[in-house]
């Protein structure tokens, strides 16, 4: 522990014990870091002062040095006291010079008041069930305070018009705006009396019953804007006497000045994100950010390369359907259009006006940034700002003077409020460049950094063509070096591993030899220009003997490639045979014995497996995908089963085998207590979720009701998994979700009866047919492809689900075609089973067509999607393995790459497709990724804890924890049938579905 000395600092207020514990804990963590630095032969000395305590932390030599120099400690304490006094004096000086800054503060306070007012209007609109801002009737709310309740205001702040708040209160409200919500309890009293002398005419009456049944139909009027004479409009209001759901009125709006940390620190990963598109990162309540490429996985990151489209909240009605916020709309029943609907449109913003405004502001900010950047590098004329470099080198390249809460990014990612605030602070903005060499070394690659959105497709087509040309050139030159006239695939890894024996001559200056996917357009063009000079030099041809086949296999996307299903089935069977043989050897038997996997999971202290590849837990082979199965097969020689208590597994062996086991012989050797302790290769211990290691219920383990336990996880508390109960539950949920989808589809067509959803049409035309209101992280697919958690999420969110059908004629044609093509078999099926099916759906009045091969067709599509996910995961694993210097595929830590932006960069992805786990990709996106497989490349910019590079763990102290978390990533938890999940109720345990925030 750090050494603590007592100083003579004056103490006015004693710190609470909790704060002191926090400081002590952090100091111990600092000391642990110093120990790790000492292992690298680095010396550290640190002095920390907290109230009356002086902490001396560092390595052994560092602490010894500081302890011998007491004058250092005294000087540091004295310096801290003086700085506190200076800070107090500065505070006084600021208060005295407040009058001199009134002009600056007037602009700032006006902006903050407008922001708070807009945010109050936004919250009030949500309470009324509208997706647009609604003016807040402040006078009525203050006069009748029990009608509308405002929750979440900071302690000590009363609700009133923002004009009555001072600067500090406005900032305080914006910092705590995440919890602010309006709750409408009842209509305002005396609705016919209005302040201001105007006589208002109301719209057509509309009402809605409370979902909780707490009160009857009510009418709530909204205040008009001050500058318009539009009549008041009635809004459908959902009234709740008490908030039954704490998240009902919460809309996940981030607060605080920090842009990169708030999302991860303040938003729990396990909580479903409602209205995540309204996440505001700074102190602006009126703007929201919508990802430009994909909305299925929303992890905001300021260092992300992909720009976000940020619009103000009033512009929701102008956003395209794919980028319109879907999870924030409260349910509203269809109501007749009011008579004055035409007048109401006057209150909405004009898109052309908004577009012209934001385009002009972005252009001004872009010119401002370029001018300031040119001043920093002392350049004349137009310059291009390397935005990715500023994001990846935040310590050496950054911008000062930006308004609080606004990060430095491309102007195209800002909304109108932030652009205006940046222009107000333009005099204070300054570019700081500490290392000019960072700009010079990559200047030629940065010419591609600023493509206009309109030319992105053209750029992608161009770079794809150039990379293919360079790849063909390299293959041709490589074949010439081998004395062949037919082009051969180049083993780039071998050339990187043996630079002295395998290298290339004639490349342009400062361009190393790598795979074409590493090059940008300028370098590719230079290589093509000197193509005649390029020559492959092979001094040791024997190094290439085993590489050609290895390299050509992943590069071929032809029908010669082995079928995925055959491949994974073969690998699983092979691993199953390895496990059975190793288990028999551990029991002293010569014949292979089937492994009772549930017994191993429930007794990890007495039954475990050593020698498994790093990061792979022991499970049934049916749980693994192709990358893990291949790693297990490669490392099969190291695998060893340890059976400390043979009596636990005897009841699961065939009758003839149990008598051959010598229990004493198995128990006599002294085996290590922990798996992997005697392994020569450092293994990371991975604990399988669920088992209770303290009280293993061995009595339940011995029960003879053991089926094919390879697929069924064993309950740690001794209760067995009931397949019948699980199957009944998931079948019922799937039927309910399917009925829900059919009902919503009928509503979208204006019908009172349900209509069977043509899922193929929704998959083929996602722009014309899509679904809004699904839970965060749940894509629209057939209910048969979901597991229990997602099915339950969909049913909980059923009120918000809405089908959007833009082309009803195409929809009706598809329904007619499917009905006409599948109706003849229906006449043949006149068995009692058909009658049962019809009676089961009679109450719902569903238009249903009985299809004999519907299940086969559905399963084939599910299997096809699984194959695509497996192939994409295999591709990512192989590319990631290449990036970290491994010669084999390595599981991609998707979650770590997401929460550590800038550490790993993925290049070569198709336009409009962002990098994420395959389970979150659409089928069309996965196909495009496989088509661009040659150009996808992982680049490790800076390692994160737990990353293995060239067989060396980056941070041994942190490796164990992350690996345990990574074992549950969606890309590696393969489920044989669908995305089945782990359900934790009293009697069953099913594999868990990946968290949507991963």
UniProtKB/Swiss-Prot annotation:
The modification N-acetylalanine is found at residue 2. Ubiquitous. Isoform 1 is strongly expressed in fetal brain, weakly in adult brain, muscle, and lymphoblasts and is almost undetectable in other adult tissues, while the other isoforms are equally expressed in all adult tissues. PROSITE patterns: GTF2I. SUPFAM superfamilies: GTF2I-like repeat. The modification Phosphothreonine is found at residues 556, 558. Residues 241-342, 662-681, 687-714, 816-836, 958-998 are annotated as: Disordered. Changing residue 460 to F: No change on BTK-mediated transcriptional activation. There is a cross-link at residues 35, 86, 92, 94, 130, 140, 185, 219, 221, 326, 343, 353, 380, 435, 450, 456, 488, 494, 526, 561, 660, 664, 670, 680, 715, 816, 827, 861, 864, 879, 891, 991 (Glycyl lysine isopeptide (Lys-Gly) (interchain with G-Cter in SUMO2)). A motif (Nuclear localization signal) lies at residues 320-327. GO terms for cellular component: cytoplasm; membrane; nucleoplasm; nucleus. The modification Phosphotyrosine is found at residues 248, 398, 503. It holds the Pfam family GTF2I. InterPro entries: GTF2I, GTF2I-like_rpt_sf, TF_II-I. It is found in: Cytoplasm; Nucleus. Residues 303-318 have a biased composition (Acidic residues). The keyword Magnesium does not apply. Interacts with the basal transcription machinery by coordinating the formation of a multiprotein complex at the C-FOS promoter, and linking specific signal responsive activator complexes. Promotes the formation of stable high-order complexes of SRF and PHOX1 and interacts cooperatively with PHOX1 to promote serum-inducible transcription of a reporter gene deriven by the C-FOS serum response element (SRE). Acts as a coregulator for USF1 by binding independently two promoter elements, a pyrimidine-rich initiator (Inr) and an upstream E-box. It is linked to GTF2I is located in the Williams-Beuren syndrome (WBS) critical region. WBS results from a hemizygous deletion of several genes on chromosome 7q11.23, thought to arise as a consequence of unequal crossing over between highly homologous low-copy repeat sequences flanking the deleted region. Haploinsufficiency of GTF2I may be the cause of certain cardiovascular and musculo-skeletal abnormalities observed in the disease. PANTHER family: GENERAL TRANSCRIPTION FACTOR II-I, GENERAL TRANSCRIPTION FACTOR II-I REPEAT DOMAIN-CONTAINING PROTEIN 1. Belongs to the TFII-I family. This is General transcription factor II-I.
